[in-house]
Amino acid sequence: MRVFIDEIARHVDQEVELRGWLYQRRSKGKIHFLILRDGTGFLQATVVQGEVPEAVFREADHLPQETALRVWGRVREDRRAPGGFELAVRDLQVVSRPQGEYPIGPKEHGIDFLMDHRHLWLRHRRPFAVMRIRDELERAIHEFFGERGFLRFDAPILTPSAVEGTTELFEVELFDGEKAYLSQSGQLYAEAGALAFAKVYTFGPTFRAERSKTRRHLLEFWMVEPEVAFMTHEENMALQEELVSFLVARVLERRSRELEMLGRDPKALEPAAEGHYPRLTYKEAVALVNRIAQEDPEVPPLPYGEDFGAPHEAALSRRFDRPVFVERYPARIKAFYMEPDPEDPELVLNDDLLAPEGYGEIIGGSQRIHDLELLRRKIQEFGLPEEVYDWYLDLRRFGSVPHSGFGLGLERTVAWICGLAHVREAIPFPRMYTRMRP
């Protein structure tokens, strides 16, 4: 009976067949210890001289890393074994042998070497754990919104304009010289969806042509972007907190083994799963950052009216044991579509959610302008071509209502939950300013 490693605990004292690859091998006297991987996990298999045919024992002594195998044996519970279970091998069959020396040996390798061999590095424990947690988060995102009646709404990748009105766009030449751009966000289209279906979410790749080499930036990354008709700024933040606490709780519940493989202390994530996220206004956050800057020379001062940089977000988020909201930024440093604060029109009803431990922003959200004339004026003030946004203005001409939404960056969220130093490890094949291969 063929089984997978992630279900091995259900087959103790049973004869099973595993199909996978040799990850590591060592020998001690009359025992060969084989660490097998099958894509669902890692398992120790023991080949004992006298308990298998002599030809099998000799074969096991010469298997190179990444040999593809079929292995038959009995599952045993053994606390000494990695994972608490092992396979007592009865027989094995080589399916294929590596053609040459496998590049990623047991010695230490630098990150550039590992990224050059990302197609092979994905087979190792650390990327295995990260990708399993990423998969868990993606599944949980769909479950969260599905259970709350949201419609999955697919936004286009090719767009005629930028959402934020920036120049950080990847340009694509279409037929007859017409130009389009790879999407920076599905937000504008999600707004159309919200006014048709009340509550929607998009989930897909987005692209930013930023010449940035920081640990938080990729050229291609994934975002989930919900949008809800009649939702206020306060309700928007409540939904963000509900989502993030749900995601963290799900990983703690189902992926504790992978967190352990990464050396990630689950206790560091427990406050985020509880909710009760602190809230600071932009003004309060600037004041706190400047107090920190007086104590820490590595944190630059932040003049009021400027946006937070990575050092400011990191310093601020380290002061909290769970994500923290920063809300109501000056309008002049935020996007054209954000609703002004009725108590102070110089501010907007927006928020950023900063992950703790120095990870910084993982969500940006706002209430959207729903007044036609105000939105038209903002488009003009930002110097954007009104004809490109005419369809977007139609959303305000016909049945306009207050509405809100946000975008959660998947890779930044994965990096925080996994405790990664760089978002390049949070996606299977990172696309960066300095890297496009493999």
UniProtKB/Swiss-Prot annotation:
<dbReference type="InterPro" id="IPR006195">
    <property type="entry name" value="aa-tRNA-synth_II"/>
</dbReference>
<keyword id="KW-0067">ATP-binding</keyword>
<comment type="similarity">
    <text>Belongs to the class-II aminoacyl-tRNA synthetase family.</text>
</comment>
<dbReference type="Pfam" id="PF01336">
    <property type="entry name" value="tRNA_anti-codon"/>
</dbReference>
<keyword id="KW-0030">Aminoacyl-tRNA synthetase</keyword>
<dbReference type="InterPro" id="IPR004365">
    <property type="entry name" value="NA-bd_OB_tRNA"/>
</dbReference>
<dbReference type="InterPro" id="IPR004364">
    <property type="entry name" value="Aa-tRNA-synt_II"/>
</dbReference>
<keyword id="KW-0547">Nucleotide-binding</keyword>
<dbReference type="InterPro" id="IPR004522">
    <property type="entry name" value="Asn-tRNA-ligase"/>
</dbReference>
<dbReference type="Pfam" id="PF00152">
    <property type="entry name" value="tRNA-synt_2"/>
</dbReference>
<dbReference type="InterPro" id="IPR045864">
    <property type="entry name" value="aa-tRNA-synth_II/BPL/LPL"/>
</dbReference>
<dbReference type="GO" id="GO:0006421">
    <property type="term" value="P:asparaginyl-tRNA aminoacylation"/>
</dbReference>
<dbReference type="InterPro" id="IPR012340">
    <property type="entry name" value="NA-bd_OB-fold"/>
</dbReference>
<keyword id="KW-0648">Protein biosynthesis</keyword>
<dbReference type="InterPro" id="IPR002312">
    <property type="entry name" value="Asp/Asn-tRNA-synth_IIb"/>
</dbReference>
<protein>
    <recommendedName>
        <fullName>Asparagine--tRNA ligase</fullName>
        <ecNumber>6.1.1.22</ecNumber>
    </recommendedName>
</protein>
<keyword id="KW-0963">Cytoplasm</keyword>
<dbReference type="GO" id="GO:0003676">
    <property type="term" value="F:nucleic acid binding"/>
</dbReference>
<dbReference type="GO" id="GO:0005524">
    <property type="term" value="F:ATP binding"/>
</dbReference>
<keyword id="KW-0436">Ligase</keyword>
<dbReference type="GO" id="GO:0004816">
    <property type="term" value="F:asparagine-tRNA ligase activity"/>
</dbReference>
<dbReference type="GO" id="GO:0005737">
    <property type="term" value="C:cytoplasm"/>
</dbReference>
<comment type="subunit">
    <text>Homodimer.</text>
</comment>
